[in-house]
């Protein structure tokens, strides 16, 4: 028997080889040293699995010839998806597992469930998983899933970590999740074996717990089978059949296996680390990597029984209660990649690399000192799949209709499985999930990145290594940068631009007055023999963001904002998505796609939403009507019929493209969608002086009469043809210039030269965030999401409900309007100058009625501004009188601050400034 202290000595005496080198699977009898004994809960299954593969014995039951949906993979996600499909009434659902249920990754997972995460959607998903495993499955089947409610304890060794936990506690109040911030002394009383000398405090969540993966998956399979679903084990999938319809759309046709084929229109890829291989069978890109992920199980520890599970984030270690012992694991900076994923791997394990694992042992011994003299009963090192942003991959693949993803769960497949299985089932049956799943949707990644090996590897490494880091609101990745750069990148970098990354693009964040801060090649934080960058200016500036207070450059952002309000600012918005929708059916398609009336004369520009069939908002964007053109140019493609120019936030361009494409396919529209995002740049000149500046650059009259708001024209700027639009995302007089790529730099320089005497300065997206919330403009996927309707969000003016023209989502909006709104988006301001970022609880008359979706500081009104949806605790409609009559407060990190509710933006509520009235 090895002890944890001996393991530390072994690791020190035997340095390991390159961390990137893949290691082959081992069976129970082949391990040496501390890994000789692996008495994990599935030892019998493992030993049985070392003989002849069960696959050779044939499938566990005959294959049906047809199915309505085939789920590939019998792990947590596969079983949860099958169960929820059956529960929602889907007939003909089949699950294919190449070995036995839980093989591959699920069988060796720790099975932890924490109820609080820094995401409102994830809190909801976790709550559903907990309901399923702790109550619903047992009620349905009479079987125990192995759920144990022993509570969870998050450890804070510094002030910022404790602040993060207080944020989680405030969010939990909006969802009824009980949690308590404990002092070190209170923590010691709860967990007597814990060292609390270095603690600032802890967050205790009494209803957290653990799940048994084998028990849960077996029970899910039985419950699904009772509802008519089929589970077929020992049946590897060897291919995906695809057909192309009359409109050139690729669709799923069937599944091939070693034992026959199944005709089906729908496949769900829940294959874990093998998901990329399954994707390749269908020509679908699945951006994930496989890594070794490990934990050790200790011998018996006196006094550990009934203790809560522990996450010591600052030590990057977790301690899971396992009877009268502990499982110890975590996330390291130098994880081992599994370079060549074997399709023979089922219930095997890797040898544990003690040098890699040492840091977790050190952290565990520091937190629970008795572990230093405690023996190691077993080690478990198996494969897990990880993704570029540490979020799962879900939804319909943009390359293939009927091919859904449910993979890449970053070692959280058990805890997220119930919620995600339910949402995936809705996605398959109804075309969309019920919740806002954009953060998990495969369409959140641009298609140019999802098969880019360096980007996938770098980002997956960084997200793994930072998994236990504090989640700060304005953090940025260092990995996978400079993938997409617009024509102004070098120009702005030289002027001190500090860039953010969105959708692969480098976009301006803010401008540092002390010179360039370029993003350098990823250094893996010094792991794998890489040399960490020294004197890295960008990393230093990013470190200033690691706070829940105002950052040091708060005043720099203030300067950018007030320059825009008082004179003028230029924003490089080239990362925007820019599409053309043209063709004979383009007007019919536009009427159906867009909630607003966009059938205005050429030269008009309309702000609109795109909705789903439930009336939820899939996008907000501008749509500009084009005049027919017989000669193509970057600013106007040649087309017959009708044409529209679409511009939307670049971070969601792929989502928009996929949504529009799917709707056009479903409607069988005869029109063309053209992506010109890479061909055009875009700068926005905003502020009271913008007209005077641009009048020197553009060859046209810019008066209100000659160039009204919400119109566009093809003009020349410093001799270059551009599309000028009179629009504003910040609530000021201003114009956007959409510019062919080759003309961006000369046009930008001409604007800056003309603006020098007017006080024109560069500004970035941190300023846009502040200016736009101050004006009351919405940001998609912040205060406007696929589960929010325009009526709830105060955007009824974007919906052509007074016209007879049908549009996608109209029926749902009409039903919602007739029934009364059950929640509304409300603007709040506070006199206390404290930063808020979202997730803060909203109190009304002493009751929690929601949480903040988005918040920032408004420099013109000199107040913190927050937006959040509120509901009536009694369950009734939320009227305007309900909003106005309440006494409000916002809870930030456990402290409440009085707040004033507004029905309109407190800044320029009559919209005079965008009209040029100052």
Curated annotation (Swiss-Prot):
For region Disordered, the annotated ranges are 1-40
Q: Where is the transit peptide?
A: 1-22
Q: Cofactor comment in the record?
A: Binds 1 FAD covalently per monomer.
Tell me the residues on which Tele-8alpha-FAD histidine occurs: 108
Q: Which UniProt keywords apply?
A: Acetylation, Disease variant, FAD, Flavoprotein, Mitochondrion, Oxidoreductase, Phosphoprotein, Transit peptide
Q: What is its EC number?
A: 1.5.8.3
- Composition-biased stretches, type Low complexity, lie in 1-13
Task: Give the sites modified to N6-acetyllysine.
Answer: 173, 559, 775, 802, 884, 904
A GO biological process this protein is involved in?
sarcosine catabolic process
As for subcellular location, the record says: Mitochondrion matrix
Residue numbers of N6-succinyllysine PTMs: 38, 173, 377, 391, 802, 884, 904
Expression sites (tissue/organ): Expressed in pancreas, liver and kidney.
A GO cellular component term found in this entry reads: mitochondrion
Task: Cite the annotated pathway.
Answer: Amine and polyamine degradation; sarcosine degradation; formaldehyde and glycine from sarcosine: step 1/1
| UniProt keyword Transit peptide present | yes
Q: What reaction(s) does this enzyme catalyze? A: (6S)-5,6,7,8-tetrahydrofolyl-(gamma-L-Glu)(n) + sarcosine + oxidized [electron-transfer flavoprotein] + H(+) = (6R)-5,10-methylenetetrahydrofolyl-(gamma-L-Glu)(n) + reduced [electron-transfer flavoprotein] + glycine
Annotated GO molecular function terms are:
sarcosine dehydrogenase activity
In the record, Phosphotyrosine modifications are located at 777
Which EC class, in a word?
A: oxidoreductase
> Matching PANTHER family, A to Z?
AMINOMETHYLTRANSFERASE, SARCOSINE DEHYDROGENASE
Can you tell me which family this protein belongs to? Belongs to the GcvT family.
Q: Which disease does the record tie it to?
A: Sarcosinemia: A metabolic disorder characterized by an increased concentration of sarcosine in plasma and an increased excretion of sarcosine in urine. Sarcosinemia is most probably a benign condition without significant clinical problems. Some reports have associated sarcosinemia with intellectual disability and neurologic problems.
Protein name stated in the entry:
Sarcosine dehydrogenase, mitochondrial
The gene for this chain is: SARDH
